A protein has these predicted regions:
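A generic local structural motif
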Residues: 10-14, 32, 56-59
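Acidic helix N-cap motif at the loop->helix transition within catalytic regions
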Residues: 9-11, 33-42, 82-83
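A conserved acidic beta->alpha catalytic loop
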Residues: 16, 20, 28-37, 51, ...
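Catalytic-site signature of metal-activated, phosphate-bearing donor transferases
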Residues: 56-62, 69-73, 80-243
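Conserved donor nucleotide-binding strand/loop of the catalytic core
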Residues: 22, 36-64
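Hydrophobic/aromatic residues located in beta-strands of well-ordered beta-sheets
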Residues: 23-26, 149
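Short, well-formed alpha-helical segments that are part of the catalytic scaffolds
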Residues: 1-20
Length: 243
């Protein structure tokens, strides 16, 4: 786990896995809220870093893990009781798959989302020696060095969008980091990317992927994704101009 001012859901997140974890490895990127005291309450000594890069920090956490099986968890995620039971069962087995794909149950302002790109699965549980971390600052993920994986049915509960202020702050950070990543790769922005991509993002999530079925309470979320696209490519355009 990587933390940085993550006190809002950190206690619930760690509590959800403490009974199945032989060790909990946390890299903290300079928290100034209650994060460190919460970690201390679980007798967790985080690895301190000044680097605010999710991919590199998660790679550091993975390198410090010693168990055969690793679960990658974010501080706004809570492992469901049914997934806990599944993991306990897996740990008792002698023959394991190299990786396990886990479904996510995403929430916006406390309400469950079922459509519009919010009903997906991710690799989060794997043999330690069979995975590495995608080294990017945004949307980092586990990468399995094998084709031997299994889909699980029990979910991780994800509370990424808790308030509008928190959500738009996260999207702003993501967009600026993503623009930097794209700039480093030599990508050029364009009028089409700045104008059309945000509109397409909004339409794809709300209409094409049937986000409207969740109810129009999710409208600020889909507008937020459009905003993130706009900010990414407009920031990239500014970086291109400064060359």
């Amino acid at each position: 786990m990587v933390t940085r001012n993550a006190d809002e859901l950190l206690f619930q997140s760690i509590k959800s896995v403490k009974d199945i974890a032989d060790e909990i490895v946390v890299v903290d990127a300079g928290s100034t809220d209650r994060t460190l005291s919460i970690l201390k309450s679980f007798n967790i000594n985080p690895i301190a870093t000044r680097l605010n890069h999710l991919g590199k920090n998660k790679s550091k956490a993975l390198s410090r893990a010693t168990g055969d099986l690793v679960l990658a968890l974010d501080s706004d995620e809570i492992v469901s009781p049914s997934l806990i039971r599944t993991i306990k069962s897996l740990k008792r087995r002698k023959i394991l798959a190299d990786g396990y794909i886990i479904p996510f149950r995403n929430h916006f302002l406390g309400r469950r989302l079922r459509y519009g790109g919010e009903n997906y699965r991710m690799l989060r549980l794997a043999k330690r020696r069979k995975v590495n971390i995608k080294n990017v600052s945004v949307h980092e993920s586990l990468v399995l060095n094998s084709k031997h994986f299994v889909n699980l049915g029990s979910p991780i509960m994800h509370y990424s969008y808790r308030t509008l202020h928190q959500m738009y702050g996260k999207f702003t950070t993501y967009a600026l980091n993503e623009a930097t990543e794209r700039y480093k790769k030599g990508e050029q922005s364009s009028f089409k990317k700045v104008t059309f991509y945000p509109v397409h993002m909004f339409w794809a999530r709300l209409i094409q992927d049937k986000g409207y079925k969740d109810g129009f309470f999710r409208l600020p979320l889909d507008l937020g994704f459009a905003y993130m696209e706009f900010l990414t490519y407009s920031s990239l355009a500014i970086k291109n101009l400064k060359k």
